[in-house]
């Protein structure tokens, strides 16, 4: 603790750089661009392989691809984070999903993952998931005689359409960078612009949680650090 200008960020920059030099995986959640310089330095030092900086700019909005993994491994946490993310976009806070809707969404995610693992020509992202639900999964529901009141696929697609292709938020979950954060050791999420946005902030929060949980579960024996500024 200390007042503004007392050197907190200066000290923390030095600390996390030393941890990074020693092989630690570091995830920083920041407001105020305190770690932009260090992140750029690491990005340059590693030839672009590390030092990943997420922020929102009008001409370069923040974007992710939560469906992408380099090794096509989708463990329980990864599948659950995808379902949680879609539920967050689909349902309002005061509108809890029915059990039948949760089951239908879980099945859709599982079948979609099965399809992209089998056919790796399909690019994993929200666009291809949306297409899968609209075509393949609609047929699955019809074959199983799932009633509209149990899962309204047209309503589902309508609510999520803004995140598809040329929709208002079509950029958000369709990043073409094919960036798997599991093996990136220095990641900064700059939240200054998105922290008050009711659409972007919940999505970014889920991505942060999933990223660190994935590291905790899969990178055994490696030191990890999550640091939240202004917590």
Model-derived regions, located:
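P-loop NTPase motor domains
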Residues: 33-49, 58-231
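Glycine-rich phosphate-binding loop of nucleotide-binding enzymes
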Residues: 1-56
């Amino acid at each position: 603790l200390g007042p503004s200008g007392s050197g907190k960020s200066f000290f923390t920059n030095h600390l996390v750089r030393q941890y990074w030099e020693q092989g630690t995986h570091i995830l920083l959640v920041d407001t105020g661009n305190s770690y932009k310089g260090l992140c750029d330095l690491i990005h340059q030092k590693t030839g672009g392989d590390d030092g990943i900086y997420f922020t929102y700019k009008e001409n370069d909005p923040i974007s992710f691809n939560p469906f992408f993994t380099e090794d096509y491994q989708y463990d329980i946490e990864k599948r659950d984070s995808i379902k949680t993310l879609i539920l967050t976009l689909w349902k309002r806070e005061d509108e809890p999903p029915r059990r039948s809707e949760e089951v239908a969404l879980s099945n859709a995610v599982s079948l979609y993952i099965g399809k992209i693992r089998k056919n790796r020509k399909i690019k994993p992202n929200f666009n291809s998931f949306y297409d899968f639900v609209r075509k393949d999964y609609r047929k699955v529901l019809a074959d199983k005689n799932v009633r509209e009141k149990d899962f309204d696929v047209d309503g589902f697609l309508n609510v999520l359409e803004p995140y598809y292709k040329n929709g208002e938020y079509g950029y958000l979950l369709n990043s073409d960078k094919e960036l798997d954060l599991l093996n990136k050791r220095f990641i900064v999420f700059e939240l200054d612009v998105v922290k008050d946005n009711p659409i972007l902030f919940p999505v970014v929060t889920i991505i942060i949680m999933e990223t660190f949980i994935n590291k905790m579960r899969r990178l055994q024996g490696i030191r990890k650090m999550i640091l939240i500024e202004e917590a």
